[in-house]
Amino acid sequence: QGNFLSERYNIPYLSSGHIFREMAKEKTQMGRWLKETINSGALVPDDKTLEIILTYLEKPEYEQGYILDGFPRTVVQAEAFNGGVDKVVFLDVSDKEALWRIAGRVSDRQDETIHAIRKRIDSFHEFTTPVVEYYQQQGKLVRVDGEQDIDGVFHDIKEELDKLV
C-alpha cells in the first residue's frame, strides 16, 4: 500500500523495517547487533529506533513529506515523533491473517521464521496496540479493513487521505 500511496501523492515511501535490514547488512557493531535483534523477532529498543529513524528522515528528499511504514511501534516513539505525523493509517488484520500472509510470502529474510513471526505478532499486541489507541485519541487514526483485497484497501485509504489534500 505504501508504494501505491507514494505514487498517488508523489511523496517518498520508506519503511522502518527496510532501514533496519539495510543497516543490519553493514559490517559494523551496530549492523551486527541490529541483525541479531531483528532475526530474534524482538523490537529494536526505543532509543535506538528514534536515533536511527529521526536521523534518516533528515535527508533532503523527505522535507516535503513521506509515507513511513512500521513506525512508531511504541507510545514512547509516538510521543517523541508527535510533530511528524499528520495521519496514521492502521490496516486492521487478524492475527491469523497476518501469520498467513507473512508465512506465505516468498522471502529469504532470516527474521521470518514461524517463531520470529509469532513473537512479532505478540510484540505488536503488547507495544503497538497502545500506539493505535494513542493516535485514535488524537484524531489522527485512519482505521482500514486490511483483510480486503489490495484494491479495496487502497480505495479506503485514498478516500480518507484525499480529505487532507
Where are these regions (language model features)?
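Glycine-rich phosphate-binding loop of ATP-dependent small-molecule kinases
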Residues: 1-165
